[in-house]
Amino acid sequence: MASNTSFLFVTVTLLLVLNVSSRALPPVADSTNIAARLTGGGLMQCWDALYELKSCTNEIVLFFLNGETKLGYGCCNAVDVITTDCWPAMLTSLGFTLEETNVLRGFCQSPNSGGSSPALSPVKL
């Protein structure tokens, strides 16, 4: 009885292995070319926006601390690209709270973000 069970188990296992190993593999995409992936648009655009955001950190700090309503076009563009085209939670992972991220996104997406819309009141320490 144990011999029949063992034989059946080995036979089924062998048939499964042969079935899986003989299937046709899908063609591999050209994902090994790192230059093509980096210049493909999306990833590079996210890195550029992150670099631009790094250069406008002072503007963002003043925006929240002093209630200044001036964020440059490049800074707003970086916030917009990061929150819409890249990983939306990236600003949160950089240390901004979810509320601050939403305020930045709302300010930069408003039609009059050129300097006439009010910002948050200054933080009192």
Swiss-Prot record:
Principal subcellular localization: cytoplasm
InterPro entries attached to this UniProt entry: EC11-15 (IPR044711), Prolamin-like (IPR008502)
Domain of life: Eukaryota
Subcellular location per the Swiss-Prot or TrEMBL entry: Cytoplasmic vesicle; Secreted
Signal peptide location: 1-24
Tissue: Restricted to female reproductive tissues, specifically accumulating in storage vesicles of the unfertilized egg cell.
Single GO cellular component term: cytoplasmic vesicle
Pfam families per record: Prolamin_like (PF05617)
Assigned keywords, A-Z: Cytoplasmic vesicle, Fertilization, Secreted, Signal
The keyword Cell membrane is annotated on this UniProt entry: no
Gene Ontology annotations of biological process type: double fertilization forming a zygote and endosperm; regulation of double fertilization forming a zygote and endosperm; regulation of protein localization to cell surface
Family indicated by similarity: Belongs to the plant egg cell-secreted peptide family.
Protein task: Involved in the regulation of gamete interactions during the double fertilization and to prevent multiple-pollen tube attraction; mediates the redistribution of the gamete fusogen HAP2/GCS1 to the cell surface after secretion upon sperm arrival.
UniProt-recorded name of the protein: Egg cell-secreted protein 1.3
